[in-house]
Amino acid sequence: LSCDPPFRSRLIENVLESCSTRREVHARIERCRVFVGTVATFSSKTDMFRLKTFDVAIVDEATQILEPQLLGLLCARNVAGNNAIGKFILIGDHKQLPAVVLQSESQSEVCEECLQSIGLYNLKDSLFERLYRTVSANHSSPTTQRFYDMLCRQGRMNVEVAQFPNRAFYGGLLEAVGLPHQQGKLVLAPGLESDEFADVLVSR
């Protein structure tokens, strides 16, 4: 099954198991306000959009999803022929791992001018990255400033570990949440104290 055991009762096939008519299925889906799943799962269950129209779709790790993989959701229509999803919120970090693409940079390069005119220069780029590149190029415009924002509080890295990526990639804007594992002296493994990387890490 596709989730942790405590949540398996909430899988859609289990939620709908007791329904005996289409009307019951429709009513149960209509009552549910939040649906969680992968892009691939939702793209393969297009019948869902005939039963329910969604106000917003939040796509996490959007920088690791190529545009064709999102196409089914972007184009989803309800029974009235309107957009089945009213708005998309893409969450990701274009400075971390990109989508996995086997082709080389030159093989995935886009040469058509009509595609380049909308910011599509390489097929390995995610929709997130293309849109971010477009709006950040016009960052002085009051309109485009409303399209994106940056989450500045991180709860993952120890404050010492975070110093380098914070300065090198995020302009010093990252702030630690202050969780227990982020605090305290960073203890290096035996043998690393004299390592050049360790010296750089400690000195910075």
Region locations from a protein language model:
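Conserved helicase NTPase catalytic core signature
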Residues: 1-55, 69
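Conserved helicase motor core of SF1/SF2 NTP-dependent helicases
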Residues: 26, 40-42, 48-204
